[in-house]
């Protein structure tokens, strides 16, 4: 079983990471590069002078290493995506041991659940941001993000698997808790990039992550079932 999980996660993570990198390179990265031109423009130096804590999420360190545009950035992005994709694929394969998909298409439902948990729900309070956008304290944002993802995971599990309607309602309430509390916000809302570019970036990020999660769910379900069938024949 461990071999089955590892093989499923490895191949799924590799394919999903390559897909994510391709979509990011073609759609998301150009928007980020365009936003960086506004952040680095000399005319915007005065815009950087915000009130205390207004830009705590974007402190710049000229000495910090950053991958250069081109192959370095693509390679760094691919490596990061691979680690994340394999980790999520391991999670899905582990869940399949508890409730194995009877059809490959059920992997799409698991992918949708992953997208809702780790992307959609957290970004309702903390939408993806371009460089030069004001943000709240990093630790506070990370804490809220983890809480939103955990609440969504528990809530969805109760809604889908609980047989009691009261538990299903409790699941919906659990999902809503972090959003009722509210995500941490900066003292002053400001951004250097145009609003139209920000809107394009949010759409691109959501659709790219949706494609990633659907691919992750579909491929992992197919591989998990295939490995199981091969094991039974052996």
List where the protein language model places each region:
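Juxtamembrane/disordered regions of integral membrane proteins
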Residues: 1-234
